[in-house]
Amino acid sequence: IRDRHYIKEYLDGLPELTKAYPEMTSVTAPIETWSDDFSMAIAGIPSMVNDFTGGSFMETHYHSQFDNDDFYDEAVYRLHHELFTLLILALDETAVVPLDFTPVLERILAGGSEITAKVEETQEQIAAITKKLIQVTEEAQEKAKQSYEETAAINTRYYALLAEGNMQEAEQLFAENREREKQLLVKFKQEQDHFVRIDWYGEVFFPHEILWKNIGLLQDSVNALEQSDVDKALEKIYQVDNNAYAFMFDEYVYRHFTDYVFNQPKDRLKWGYGRLLGHEDLYHVVKCLLKKRKEADTDYREELHYLKECYKKQTRRLCETLKAVSYTHLR
């Protein structure tokens, strides 16, 4: 959940660099949890890292016996040094940290629009709260856009003064904007605190995205069971939180690998502390459905009741989360 605007502008203005990748360079967000930079970002320090997860090197060589000098690539080495050295120089020539919050708000809008489009009449409360979220987000988006344009103008002026050798005026402009940068970094930290959550696979999402996904999966599982399609129901339940473990392990192992996530000291969980929204325990539903499938038993009344209660719980949590975003976090 990160700004890409400045980096894209930086890439567009680069001179000819060493050609190492046929696909050239692209910018992705958010930072993934495997990177140390994730911990820096959620602590309020804007950060970035080179992404190598999509290439064959990550799959076949990284952290293996092949990760050695024999596979050194001169072009890649040079490109990384050129690219990131120039980026450091570019950032050094800004008077204010170039943070643009409009991509965050665009993603909230997209999620809100999806929820509004799919909610049924029985979910009028969600629809009403989501419409409010969209309204507040659109207002915040306009302010964020204006703020970034002002920051960009300041940095353009600062760069010009440095290029002219007018150090006295450049230093004055830099000093005048310390409070602006301070407020931007405060906003960045708030963004990380309020919006950065992770699912049980370490993927980064907004809190309402995780809840909305669970609601959809639970609704699909209910619909499947009502049609006696136990295979489809199990397929959906498998994707809810950490319930994949219920299919593969006994209850002790399931609870161990679920509970230990929540029962760690805070100083051991810097990157993930408070980022999980919770866990919908469907262990007994899974085991009962697997048993009934084996025995050709199609009486799913107990499982349907439990799943519907879980659905209601996730819906209440979604309403609370959407309200928090609308009435607090975007103000």
Where in this protein do the model-derived segments appear?
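Conserved small/polar residues in nucleotide/adenosyl-binding loops
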Residues: 1, 328-329
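Sequence-level signature for long, low-complexity tracts enriched in small/hydrophobic residues
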Residues: 274, 294-296, 300-301
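Metal-dependent peptidase/peptidase-like ectodomains
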Residues: 1-61, 73, 123-210, 215
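Extracellular/periplasmic ectodomains of large secreted or surface enzymes and adhesion receptors
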Residues: 107-131
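His/Asp/Glu-rich mid-to-C-terminal helical/loop segments that flank catalytic regions of hydrolases
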Residues: 57-109, 231-239, 244-266, 279, ...
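Residue-level signal for secondary-structure boundary elements
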Residues: 96-99, 116, 120, 145, ...
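Phosphate/adenylate-binding glycine loop and adjacent helical scaffold
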Residues: 227-228
